[in-house]
Amino acid sequence: MSDKLMNTLQRLQQLRQRELNQATSQLAQQKQLCQRYQNNINALGSLTHFALMPVAGAALMTNSASYKRNIQRVIDWQKQEQVLANIEAGKLQTHLQQQACREKIVAVVLEQQQQQQQVAQGRREQKITDGLAAQCWQRRQAG
């Protein structure tokens, strides 16, 4: 196996690892976004509980109802955004798994090639050792 091919495999593995790291980072950011939506929904939900207190007067009741309605619209919008964010997180999770598989394949191939290269180097060294031993033996026999 040539050094050029080994260098190419090593560079490919580095690229795959970088892609895997980017996919991991993107997924983490997306999960944080999903959590922010959930936190927003919870906070907005608590605002509607304050509006449930009894109010006196028609104007205050109308104002309270309008407030609750508007808060509920924002909650519904946040829930829709959360669903979309969860879908995107699922896609990113799938992409991450694909990137991990691609990186692992290259890592395994590189490791196999390195092992083959070490075995070949060991054979070359053994041939040299055997050749030197044969020369020594022949010199002793001749001398």
Enumerate the predicted regions with their spans.
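Charge-rich amphipathic alpha-helical interaction elements
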Residues: M1-G143
